[in-house]
């Protein structure tokens, strides 16, 4: 079993003490996010956990516990989101300069192969256009590529509640700017930056990039999309059993996570977070 901590909330940033308490107990009770009255017990005992995948904006509160996690024998890697957007969109996330520092420290402790940078979501607004993303991504790649092995990019999904929240703040999403053609062009620029920076680049659950891809297993990018021989960025897995096998000598077989979106290629995992308790305050977040 892979434990995801967590798509729903930033456990490393805000609930690392809570996580460690339950890790020591060897068990956690997780509520169904859609039916809170339904609960299930999830074992966190070493013999039941193949690995942890930590999702975060700020790993620093958990970093002081990494020695204990490693002594207990748990494999893990980090997915760390850094977008560098204006504070109106993400008022309480770490500054870019802070992110570069903790990336460097964490890479020095566990190696860059266990650090994955997420540039997610790619959003278009009146003040955040194509050229902003090209320059922003390039600057972030220059800062973070010495300390990360891979970057995962994903475009903004216009959930109604999120669009309402953005509009209330006076921010209109530029949907035309986020067209499939624009996405493909932008990803080509991202791919060139990633190649120069020594970063592997993947997309996350993007219909424009995974049409024709076999979803029952990890596949190569499709051919003939958007007038290109193949898209500039292929589909990837945030929860990646192949990476875990490579890093830790595991023997995990691929099984698509049935609880995720159709186009998501992630390995099946158990998420131990809950919605509505992240304190970063990002206006575009679907988990608020």
Model-derived regions, located:
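A structural motif corresponding to the C-terminal lobe/cap of the Radical SAM core domain
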Residues: 170-186
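Local cysteine-cluster metal-coordination motifs and their immediate loop/turn environment
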Residues: 262, 270-288
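A C-terminal junction/extension of Radical SAM enzymes
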Residues: 181-257, 262
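Flexible glycine/acidic-rich beta-alpha junction loops that bind and position SAM and/or redox cofactors
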Residues: 90, 123-127, 150-175, 205-217, ...
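Active-site beta-loop-alpha junctions enriched in small/polar residues
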Residues: 8-10, 57, 81-85, 120-122, ...
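Conserved Radical SAM active-site core
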Residues: 1-89, 96, 100-112
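Conserved C-terminal portion of the radical SAM core fold
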Residues: 98-164, 189-205
């Amino acid at each position: 079993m892979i434990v995801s901590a967590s798509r729903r909330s930033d456990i490393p940033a805000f609930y690392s003490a809570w996580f460690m308490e339950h890790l020591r107990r060897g068990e956690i009770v997780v509520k169904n996010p859609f039916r809170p009255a339904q609960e299930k017990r999830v074992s966190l005992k070493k013999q039941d956990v193949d690995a942890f995948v930590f999702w975060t904006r700020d790993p620093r509160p958990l970093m002081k516990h990494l020695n204990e996690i490693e002594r207990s024998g748990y494999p893990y890697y980090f997915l760390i989101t850094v977008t560098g957007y204006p504070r109106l969109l993400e008022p309480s996330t770490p500054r870019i300069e802070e992110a570069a520092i903790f990336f460097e420290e964490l890479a020095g402790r566990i190696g860059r192969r266990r650090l994955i940078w997420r540039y997610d979501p790619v959003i278009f607004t009146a003040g955040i256009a194509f050229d902003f993303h090209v320059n922003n991504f390039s600057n972030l790649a220059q800062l973070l590529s010495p300390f990360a092995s891979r970057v995962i990019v994903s475009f903004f999904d216009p959930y109604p509640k999120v669009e309402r929240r953005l509009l209330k703040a006076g921010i209109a999403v530029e949907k035309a700017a986020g067209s499939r053609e624009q996405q493909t062009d932008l990803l080509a620029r991202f791919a060139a930056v990633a190649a120069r920076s020594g970063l592997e680049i993947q997309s996350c659950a993007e219909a424009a990039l995974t049409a024709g891809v076999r979803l029952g297993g990890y596949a190569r990018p499709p051919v003939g999309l958007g007038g290109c021989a193949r898209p500039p960025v292929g589909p990837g897995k945030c929860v990646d059993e192949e990476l875990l096998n490579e890093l830790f000598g595991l023997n995990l077989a691929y099984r698509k996570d049935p609880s995720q979106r159709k186009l998501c290629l992630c390995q099946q995992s158990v998420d131990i977070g809950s919605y509505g308790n992240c304190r970063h305050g990002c206006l575009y977040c679907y988990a608020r």
